[in-house]
Amino acid sequence: MIIVIIMPKNENNPNIKNNNHQSPKKRIALTAGTFDLLHPGHFNTLNFAKKHADELVVVLARDETVKRIKGRRPVIPEEQRKIMIETLKPVDKAILGSLTDKLEPILSVKPDIIVLGPDQTTYQLEELKNQLLERGFKTEIVKVEEYVKCPFHSSYDILKEIIRRWCNKEIELK
């Protein structure tokens, strides 16, 4: 004798596998920067961003973009910076930015939140929000307010100190 028990479909029953059930959408945060000579400010921004999401995607500025904006190329080449950033604990994925459209990586990733570092100058919060809205994309954008103060809180300061120590002279970089 075979007994067949037919159980009604019930979302609350753990014994029933619902193939239509989708796992909850992971919240994605995106932050961007050069991340050339790593310092505590970078880690502060990355940790802040990760606290606001399940996944953190970091967009690294391309060497040519950095040269155009800052007037100098990064010390560490983009592919090497990408390897360094993607191995950091809070980072789930690192991608290189676009050479032609700074919004392209954002529109590709479609983050739930964009985190701007405290010294971010490439993106201004309201300007970025408006540019994304013009392209039909709405997302939360926050700026890290806490600026980590320490002797070497910027890549620029680290570079100046290296030159001072190695060349034994003070210089002003572009």
From Swiss-Prot:
- Keyword Plastid listed: no
Instruction: Name the EC number(s).
Output: 2.7.7.2
The yes or no answer to whether the keyword Metal-binding is present is no
What Pfam families does the database record attribute to this sequence? CTP_transf_like (PF01467)
Q: In which pathway does it act?
A: Cofactor biosynthesis; FAD biosynthesis; FAD from FMN: step 1/1
**Record-level GO BP terms:** FAD biosynthetic process; FMN metabolic process
Q: Which InterPro entries match?
A: Archaeal_FAD_synthase (IPR050385), Cyt_trans-like (IPR004821), FAD_synth_RibL (IPR024902), Rossmann-like_a/b/a_fold (IPR014729)
Annotated residues that bind ATP are located at: 34-35, 39-42, 119, 147
TM regions (residue ranges): none
**Entry keywords, A to Z:** ATP-binding, FAD, Flavoprotein, FMN, Nucleotide-binding, Nucleotidyltransferase, Transferase
Cofactor(s) this protein cannot do without: a divalent metal cation
Query: Can you state which reaction this protein catalyses?
Result: FMN + ATP + H(+) = FAD + diphosphate
Q: Which GO terms describe its molecular function?
A: ATP binding; FMN adenylyltransferase activity
Quaternary data? Homodimer.
Which protein family is named in the record?
Belongs to the archaeal FAD synthase family.
Describe the task this protein carries out. Catalyzes the transfer of the AMP portion of ATP to flavin mononucleotide (FMN) to produce flavin adenine dinucleotide (FAD) coenzyme.
Identification of the protein by name: FAD synthase
Q: Which organism is it from?
A: Methanococcus voltae (strain ATCC BAA-1334 / A3)
| Lineage of origin | Archaea, Methanobacteriati, Methanobacteriota, Methanomada group, Methanococci
